[in-house]
Amino acid sequence: MTFHFHIPLAFRDLLKSGGIGQYVVQEVLPVRHVDAQFAAFQTSFRTEAPLCILQHFDTLYSILHHFRSLDIAIKEDVLEVMVKVASRHANELPAILEDLNLSVPQRAAHLNALKMNCFILTQLIEAFEAETYKASLGSVEPSGKGKKAKSKPEGFSWESERESILQALTHLLQLDIRRLWSMSVVEEEFVSMMTSCCYKMMENPNIVMAKNKSTREALGHLLGVTVKRYNHMLSASVKVIQLLQHFEHLASVLVHTVSLWATEYGMKPVIGEIMREIGQKCSQDLSRESSGFKAFATFLTELAERIPAIMMPSISVLLDYLDGENYMMRNSVLTVMGEMVVRVLSGDQLEEAEKSSRDQFLDTLQEHLHDVNTYVRSCVIQIYNRIVQEKALPLSRFQSVVTLVVGRLFDKSVNVCKNAIQLLASFLANNPFTCKLSSVDLKVPLEKETKKLKEMREKYQGPKPVVVISPEEEWEAMLPEVLEAFKILQQESKEEEDIETEEIESSQHLREQILILLRKTSYKNSIRLTQKGIERFQEDPLFSEGDSEAKSELGILEKIFTEKKADLEQPTTKDQDDAQVNPTSEELPSQEVQNSDMDKQEMLVQYLSDAHHFALKIEEAIDVISKMMYETAVSVVQEVIEFFVTVSQFGVSQALLGVRRMLPLVWSKEPGVREAVLSAYRRLYLSSNGESERVKAQALVRSLSLLMVDSSAGILQCLEEIVSEFVQKGDIHPSVIQLLWEKFTQKSPCSEFERRAAVMLLGMMTRGQPEIVMSNLDTLVSVGLGEQVQKDYQLAREVCNCILKITDSQKQTLGKSTEPFRLPKDHSLFVCLTEAVAGGIGLSGLHWLPFKETAVRLVYELGEEPEEICSEILLRCSQNVLDGHQTQDEVPNVPAFLLTHLLSLAGDVALQQVVHLERAVSAELRRRRVLKEEQEAEKVGKQRKSKANESTMEEELGLVGASADDIEAELIRKICDTELLGGQQYLSAFLPLILRICNNPGRYSDPDLCTVATLALAKYMMISSDFCDTHLRLLFTLLEKSPLPSVRSNIMIALGDLSIRFPNLIEPWTPNLYARLRDPSREVRKTAGMVMTHLILKDMVKVKGQVSEMAVLLIESDQEISALARNFFNELSNKGNAVYNLLPDIISRLSDPDCGVEEEAFRTIMKQLLSYITKDKQTESLVEKMCHRFRTARTERQWRDLAHCLSLLPFSEKGLRKMQDCFDCYGDKLSDEAVYNSFLTTVAKMRRGAKPELKALIDEFEQKLSRCHNKGLENMDVPEEPSAESDAQPPKAKRPPLASVNVKKGKSEDDFQTPKPPASRKSRRKVAVNFSSDEESDLEAELSEAETPKNPTPIRRTARSRAK
């Protein structure tokens, strides 16, 4: 063998002549000779085995050269044979490699054969891969008419062959083939050839498909062998990075491959190399490839899920990305940290270094909870969610993380809020404290155990140990001061008084005196005494020592201080030792037991303290989350609902708040929200397991009753919808209904509230199953409305409501031709109701009024001839009121509360009579007419055969039906106008009294009586348009002048109903309705806001510029009113261009110096209103209108307001051009600093995200603004002489704040008159209606047609108008 096979860089390089002894392809066979030569190769393979390729390589090369032109059968045969050659070679090589007598030519032959075989196989792999990929691209193209889809060759599938080829190559590489090379070093080109085909296969997007899983496995193993045995690690690391940058689909594939290298092949360093390569990539490099960041982020994230422990040593190389601009890389690195915390750094057995790493990771995560990017904040919360669910978060961090997450509930991002709610729910579900988290319940044991811990400390530890300082240490501290005193003494004259020493009897006494002086820091005197001792007690060894005078005295002082002090301390120490040896009779536990008890108690207190603080934070979160219940984002609402289900299961004290707020969502138009509410209540109240039906029923009734405590009518209606839904679907067991009847009939002991709750629940269930009440109607009447009714009118009212549910269910089920369900007028129900209402009119309790209202409605809903029943009730009540109150002059003197009851009853009857006529009587007339027409049609029996005739008949019948409807409606209207309030009717008997009280509010001063009389008048006005027109001025006068907020609120509500019934009569008074929006009473403003919202959204009131009064409510300090105003504009914004059309007038009114609002308030209002302008055309139009408005602006305040409004609009290129076109309108106003700054804000907003060509236009506009601003400032520097006219002009009055406007009380009745029209309006003089308290005659305040206003009264927000 005289040649060696050199692996070429390119396929065609083998045709070129290389170095000496290098193999070169001699001839590329033509296609027609390929079959014959390939057959010869097969024959040679049977005899020469793998070495046959040495003679037939040119044939195989030719096949590859003509690969696209060859038939599929040849390709398949070549592939099959080459796989056999490689497998055969792999089987023979182990023995050859072990042969010590292998000659050099034989080794060279096997090496050449190995390289040739592998070269041909890798080239075949790449050729088949390219052909398959091209075919897959072609199969995606749509086939036109007449085109046949390309049929795949039968019997051959490249996808199924790939795995066997890769396994054959892997088998070869697993052998010790290094021995074939000289120096046992495999050439790099061979390794590159083997791996490049693998990377080529990975580039195919189809590699990620599930069917190619085995191929991915084979690729991973082949590359793993090269990384481990052939020094391919660094090259593989670089190649992985390149593949990730260019092929986004490979992230998951490479994660599997790389983790395989690290785990099964033990090549952990490759992970560090890849992470280092990623860490060294700069943002500029990655920005060129849009998919680069995403692929790297996905790769790191999924790799951390597989091998976080192996990645952990190299995490530092990625930390720079946390400060980078790309949020995906930040998310990826943070996710990697989270996985390491969960799977590597969790548990109690961590070392200090591991704890430190965990804390650093958690600190980093906490910092990025406030990341500037929404997606990062959301990702961090999700990471924490996983950490909490895996119980990997240290207890010491619970408080800080929960606090941060509660803060994220206020995030502007919907995803962040949603994930924050999920995390708080996970905190609850995985909390290590207790299953019942109530701060109130936890506070008591915490205080108890804290007190116990304090007592234990006092008992076991005793007084705090005193720090013991040795005499030598004390002397060292004193020495500088002693030396200073010695120097001072040497300088002083000896004329100072000598210390008397007569009393010193001995040297021992002298020592004690010196020690006392030293303790008192009297160093000079102690030195003098020492000098005296040296002179006097020479026989004492202490005073006779020392070389020099100074050293002698200092030495004596030191010895006296240290020795004497030590002697004095010894007895104390001895006493303490004796005390330890001889303890008191009360034996204390050993020190170990004491320490153990103390540790246990401290841990208990810490546990309770953490639990208490955690419960407080959760309750704080509940308050915030409950306000998110009505967000527009469905996903957030669903998470809130799920959160409150979790909270309720853990017994948090405020959970009921959220569960109640959840109820109105059952009316949501979003099916997902409604279903979430129903599912939540089903889980909360119907999912008890492992208990008897009786126990479940008791628990359900108890829970629902608790939910009804202090609930409003709206909440109860929502609960009724849910309960009826459960009943219809059979979710409520009959044992629950049985228990409710037992509670109502007092067979089961219960409180009064529980009894009422049982009746309410029975009524709710009746909507879903009417038989519940229908079959027990007699029981309801006898128990709830029987002899004991006067003891509990609340229960009686709920019984009436329960029976009314029959009618509600009947309305839903009965058809138009079915006779309505009604009871005879002598039924026991109406007998009991008559007795209950008449018997309670004389009682002064508060519960009779609502009972009476419900009873009257029940009579009209269920009774036949209800007007006769109610006339009997009114007669009985009138007699009861008059009985016992007659005087000698036969003029009754009736208490105010009796009149209140009587007039309230009369008003309810009047209103229900109208409702009865409009609904029940009208529907019955229509039903009878339709039934009669059907019967007549059956008698005639004529059938139309042609479709034309049938349609003609239907049209005729339709016209007849419409005409008949009009006739019936006219009949009902005539009855209301002429008969109901006629002189002989029972309702008219109460009218004089009602009008007298309303006309004389000074004489009838009882607030309740005035309120009820006004309401009764309004209800009477609902009957007849003539009566309404006659007394409308009286009603509006009371609305404006009455000092009672309850009267004004009730009138406002009544006028809302009157606007719907008689819109033409109320329309001229519309300004008076708007005026109540600035009423001094909070309740009246709230009521007016609700009424006007209803009327405007129902198109019952024309929306004019006066709607600015509603806009003012946006800045109300009362949260309910401001929320009502926000809701109004939210709904109005959904009605086409309503808000857009009103904005110019609203801006004009609110910025008016005479009747506008303060500047800050104006900005707050406009920020809300301009947020509804989202369409470009609307913005452009508003920009133009506001720019032109600058010309007519009178004050600088108006300039600022207009400029601020412009800064709030969302600008486009067209909007900018509009501003430039209108520059002359506002250019001269730019000298005002505030105006100029607002325009700069507008420019800055437009610059964000603008295209390059638009930025040039913005820069030009900004320069123009700057020039005008500077020019205006220069002109302002020139002083101007003030004109006389401007000096003489008085300041204009400004609108006082709402709080300063009060209704004057205590005035005479002359003040109660209809306000005069403005002076500028010329009209005929109108009669002013005066009310005098001295009047005795009945005034009906009837006005002529001329006195009724025909045009709206303009509203002026000036103090002057209020003073009139």
UniProtKB/Swiss-Prot annotation:
Positions of modified residues (Phosphothreonine): T1314, T1348, T1353
Region (Disordered): 567-596, 1273-1364
Cross-referenced Gene3D superfamilies: Leucine-rich Repeat Variant
Cystine residue pairs: none
Biased composition (Basic and acidic residues): 567-577
Post-translational modifications reported in the UniProt record: Phosphorylated by CDK1. Its phosphorylation, as well as that of XCAP-H and XCAP-G subunits, activates the condensin complex and is required for chromosome condensation.
Compartments where located: Nucleus; Cytoplasm; Chromosome
Skewed-composition ranges (Polar residues): 579-596
Ranges spanned by the short sequence motif Bipartite nuclear localization signal, renumbered to the chain: 1317-1326
GO CC entries: condensed chromosome, centromeric region; condensin complex; cytosol; nucleus
Region annotation (Interaction with XCAP-E and XCAP-C) ranges: 1-588
GO term, biological process aspect, one: meiotic chromosome condensation
Composition skew (Acidic residues), residue ranges: 1333-1345
Principal location class: nucleus
One Pfam family, short name: Cnd1
Quaternary context: Component of the condensin complex, which contains the XCAP-E/SMC2 and XCAP-C/SMC4 heterodimer, and three non SMC subunits that probably regulate the complex: XCAP-H/NCAPH, XCAP-D2/NCAPD2 and XCAP-G/NCAPG.
Function statement: Regulatory subunit of the condensin complex, a complex required for conversion of interphase chromatin into mitotic-like condense chromosomes. The condensin complex probably introduces positive supercoils into relaxed DNA in the presence of type I topoisomerases and converts nicked DNA into positive knotted forms in the presence of type II topoisomerases. May target the condensin complex to DNA via its C-terminal domain.
Annotated domain remarks: The C-terminal domain interacts with histones H1 and H3, and may be responsible for condensin complex targeting to mitotic chromosomes. This domain is independent from the bipartite nuclear localization signal, although they are contained within the same region.
Protein name: Condensin complex subunit 1
